[in-house]
């Protein structure tokens, strides 16, 4: 198995740092991306690392914030085969509170109509190598940094979040 960080908040090499996350993972059966980061940074850094994102067959979006899935639209344009696994609630509106303002940080909900996007509602087994699981309660893994994050119902409960087990 190989895991390469393509997008992260910090960097110690020639890759561009960006608020967000994208991991390129190779298993025996898959070339996948766990998250896509917020923008074109994932494509630029993949090119620097010699990774052909056209070869990616699976994408897992951890949750519905643009720092983890903002590059989804561009990825769908540049890769014509990967299946994208995402919790259905990830496409609901999400916000970050900045002073008195609620700044949208959600994903483009129009993308959920794409036939390659697989909308999930809870745990899901992709195959014997890849399993997705959710956490029922925000309290189990909450960070104080999340206290400024909201959805249309109030404080973000992260019911749109999923994790990848390899």
Predicted regions and their residues:
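Beta-strand-turn-beta hairpins that frame and shape the catalytic cleft
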Residues: 1, 27-31, 124-132
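Conserved beta-strand hairpin/beta-sheet module of binuclear metal-dependent hydrolase folds
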Residues: 2-49, 157-166
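Hydrophobic/aromatic beta-strand patches that form the interior of the parallel beta-sheet core
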Residues: 4, 60, 85, 118, ...
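Short, acidic Gly/Pro/Ser/Thr-rich loop/turn segments
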Residues: 10-13, 41, 93, 138-142
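Active-site metal-binding motif and surrounding structural segment of the metallo-beta-lactamase
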Residues: 41-86
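Short acidic low-complexity segments
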Residues: 52-55, 118-126
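Hydrophobic alpha-helical segments and helix pairs
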Residues: 69, 74-77, 81-121
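Active-site-proximal loop/helix segment associated with metal-binding centers of metalloenzymes
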Residues: 98-102, 122-166
């Amino acid at each position: 198995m190989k895991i390469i960080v393509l997008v992260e908040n910090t960097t110690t090499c020639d890759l561009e740092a960006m608020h967000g996350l994208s991991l390129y993972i190779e298993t025996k059966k898959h070339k996948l991306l766990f998250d896509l980061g917020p923008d074109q940074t994932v494509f630029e850094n993949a090119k620097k690392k010699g990774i052909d994102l056209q070869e990616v067959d699976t994408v897992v979006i951890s949750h519905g914030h643009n720092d983890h899935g903002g590059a989804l639209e561009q990825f769908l344009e540049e890769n014509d085969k990967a299946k994208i696994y995402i919790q259905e609630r990830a496409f609901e509106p999400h916000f970050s509170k900045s002073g008195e303002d609620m700044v949208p940080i959600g994903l483009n909900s129009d993308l959920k109509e794409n036939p390659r996007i697989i909308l999930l509602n809870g745990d899901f087994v992709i195959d014997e190598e890849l399993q997705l699981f959710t956490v029922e309660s925000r309290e189990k893994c909450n960070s104080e940094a999340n206290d400024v994050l909201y959805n249309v119902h109030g404080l973000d409960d992260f019911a749109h979040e999923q994790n990848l087990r390899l």
